[in-house]
A protein has these predicted regions:
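Aromatic-capped interface at the extracytoplasmic side
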Residues: 7, 14-37
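Long, amphipathic coiled-coil "stalk"/hairpin helices in large membrane-associated assemblies
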Residues: 30-87, 151, 164-168, 195-197, ...
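A structural signal for short beta-strand/turn segments enriched in small hydrophobics and glycine
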Residues: 52, 60-69, 138, 145, ...
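Short hydrophobic beta/alpha edge segments that flank linear recognition/processing sites
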Residues: 64-83, 143-148, 173-192, 240, ...
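Elongated periplasmic alpha-helical coiled-coil
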Residues: 40, 47-48, 78, 104, ...
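Extended amphipathic alpha-helical segments
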Residues: 28-30, 79, 83-86, 90-101, ...
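Hydrophobic alpha-helical membrane-insertion signals
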Residues: 166-168, 179, 185-287
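Membrane-entry signal-anchor segments at the cytosolic-membrane interface
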Residues: 1-11
């Protein structure tokens, strides 16, 4: 009987020790399975309206900064550019004419005082200023027409991955309306949600270990980039405050809120590709 009690006591002590060790490990190194891979997503938006004539990429392809993505029919913008050039020539001629008329009148007035009324000289001077303004406006119109012509070619603003490509040859695109997303290749991070009670003693630059659900046998080393300073309230009026909304797991009991923590990886294995939205687990190593 005593032997049985001793065995039970030993088992209870062992279980208690294991539980205490795990608790201490979790307290010193909090972890969460509620993590996701994130990255900056750039909306590729044409600056001009028109019909797409060429598409040089396919969905989910990799591109380099400066790669040509697609072209918009330039016909209208070529015509506008030539029209702006013609208007500048006309404005140049009118400016030269106004300047010559003013110069002749002033020379005549200089030779014979009173030969040209003061009002006429004033009107001629105003005509020159108006012609000069029209000339500057014509120059600006040329610059605008040239920009619009350049905007018919849409380039990748950074290295990254094309996703959600919704444009084809013949599609009509509208200025300032996104047509494709570009995931910035150099902006990946892991975002995990930790209970507020787990963040005591956690600081930016603390080390972290990340495990992806897709590659749970590979531990990725990283460090904390930032800790969220606010989340949106679940209930109540918050307005358009742009704070992240983190829904609690349970509604019927009072639980610690979850705060977003961003982790950047120190190095990526060459055979491992991060994708936005992948599930991840994060373990923080306190200093």
């Amino acid at each position: 009987m005593i032997k049985r009690y001793l065995i039970t006591l030993i088992l209870l002590c062992t279980a208690g020790t294991v539980l205490y060790t795990h608790y201490q490990t979790y307290t010193n190194n909090p972890w969460t399975r509620d993590g996701q891979v994130s990255a900056y997503v750039i909306s590729i938006t044409p600056r001009v309206t028109g019909q797409v004539t060429q598409v040089y990429v396919v969905d989910n392809s990799k591109v380099k900064k400066g790669d040509l993505l697609f072209e918009i029919d330039p016909s209208t913008y070529v015509a506008s550019y030539h029209k702006a050039l013609a208007n500048q020539k006309q404005a140049t001629a009118l400016l030269a004419k106004a300047q010559n008329e003013e110069q002749r009148a002033r020379k005549l007035e200089k030779r014979t005082h009173g030969a040209v009324p003061a009002l006429t000289l004033s009107n001629l001077h105003n005509a020159v200023q108006t012609a000069q303004a029209n000339f500057e406006l014509a120059k600006a119109n040329i610059e605008e027409a040239q920009l619009n012509l350049d905007f018919t070619k849409v380039y990748a603003p950074t290295d990254g991955y094309i996703t959600n490509l919704n444009v084809r040859v013949g599609s009509q695109v509208v200025a300032n309306s996104p047509v494709v997303a570009l995931i910035d290749e150099n902006s990946f991070w892991i975002e995990g949600y930790f209970k507020e009670t787990d963040l005591a003693g956690i600081a930016p630059s603390d080390r972290a270990t990340v495990t992806l659900l897709m590659h749970d046998d590979v531990a990725l080393e990283g460090k904390i980039k930032s800790i969220g300073f606010g989340i949106a309230k679940k209930d109540g009026i918050t307005g358009n405050d742009l704070l992240p909304t983190v829904n609690p797991n349970f509604q019927w009991i009072r639980l610690a809120q979850r705060i977003p923590v961003k982790v950047t990886l120190n190095e990526m294995p060459k055979d491992l590709q991060l994708r936005v939205g992948m599930t991840a687990s994060i373990k923080i190593i306190k200093h």
